[in-house]
């Protein structure tokens, strides 16, 4: 049942043979789009000649967009986002002395997820409202499951945890316009490219480990 090192090695090889050539073509198109003739490593985050898409709106406006998005997505996500926002379970604004990074963590005694981040005015701010919220929704539902799931296994293992977060990034696509307005198409392309490019990177880290 499941898979082992041999199966993962086979998957990595398939990525090398099937995915990497396609990513090379995608990156060539990106470089043509940006006008960078001899791209260096530090150019890898530049996706558009006129700048990458950024979210439009204040903190309150983005959080209101998140509430609208999750209310329209499903009754379960509506309940979830109301709980998270009403109980102030988001600490996402940058401030002096605050540690870097972004993550979701469960507070078992309260059966609540907590989302930590450092918004900086980039598309990554919205990724917090989708990716980290995907982790948080999994924890929120697991903690309230009628199956009484033990705390130790409410959070999935490293090999499956990203299913919930990455899925939420794509499930919320119909609402990305709430955050990016006229730059929505640019964000959709950036998001698709970056998700695709992650595959060989993830495999590289796995092989190193």
What residue spans do the PLM features occupy?
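Cation-handling catalytic/transport regions enriched in His/Asp/Glu
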Residues: 1-209
